[in-house]
Amino acid sequence: MTVRIAINGFGRIGRNVLRALYETGRRAEISAVAINELADAAGMAHLLKYDTSHGRFAWDVRQERDLLTVGDDTIRLLHIPEIGSLPWRELNVDIVLDCTGVYGSRADGEAHLKAGARKVLFSHPGGHDLDATVVYGVNEKELLPEHLLVSNASCTTNCIIPIIKLLDDAWGIESGTVTTIHSAMHDQQVIDAYHPDLRRTRAASQSIIPVDTRLAAGITRIFPKFNDRFEAIAVRVPTINVTAIDLSVSVRDAVKASEVNALLHSASLGAFSGIVDYTELPLVSIDFNHDPHSAIVDGTQTRVSGQHLIKTLVWCDNEWGFANRMIDTTLAMAASGFSLDAAASIKL
């Protein structure tokens, strides 16, 4: 069965999802039938073809009116602001990938269902009333047919959760702190300009800028037992892609740095292959650009203090890695099964 998807929002994640669909050879499993984006069609096609972070898209891209052709595939382009007016029923859409970064509530998801979609996957953390939050590689096997509205969590949650699980299973995590060192994002300013967050009024290319993060809440969402046991802070740095995460955890059992690295290296070759990677090469952030893994452990930076405090440095391409997990989770949602009429299950 080929899963029919529509992408709502064709920004950084939406475009990377479509590129990943073709570049990773999963076009036989997933067919993109429509993209909804308020920007003009010519701009959508241009930014798909030419990307500052990820280079030129190798597939032939053509656009005529509101039709986008990628290779031999034709995708309908929509410019509809209201979810309820989207033609998902007409297009027989199985799963909507909502990549707007704006929508994420149950009401938003139900609007997609009422429009005819069978399931919805949000590309960012959603409300607590969604049916499930998935970090692929950790809990996607818990998906059920009745999970219609799903969040793919965040890029940083996808990066750190597999590492937390591995360390906790091996030595028992008691508490932890996380520092996200994140590339600049679209909600920052090119030059100083007004923003409700005064730190984000400053030019993104000239400063390391502390910002709020809900990563600790994201950890608790996946592992409720860590409620009030993790804290997180975040800074934005003057690069356009790739993120590093500094994870420190206090563990119950004594451990050596060499044992931590052995565990994480083994996991990258085994149970977490394709999700976690491991390196001891002297690399820098740009070297992880366009890397499809959720997390890449830098073994040269692993430290253990007093046998019970572990510090690790984990890299991720916050765009490309996350876009690949969007595709993985889409396939997992389809594999879990569909109800006969998603819209009929909504409590009106």
Swiss-Prot record:
Enzyme Commission code: 1.2.1.72
Key words of the record: Cytoplasm, NAD, Oxidoreductase, Pyridoxine biosynthesis
Pfam families registered for this protein in UniProt: Gp_dh_C, Gp_dh_N
PROSITE patterns per the UniProt record, alphabetical: GAPDH
Binding positions (NAD(+)): R12, I13, N318
Subunit and partners: Homotetramer.
Protein name as it appears in the record: D-erythrose-4-phosphate dehydrogenase
Source species: Erwinia tasmaniensis (strain DSM 17950 / CFBP 7177 / CIP 109463 / NCPPB 4357 / Et1/99)
Gene symbol of the encoding locus: epd
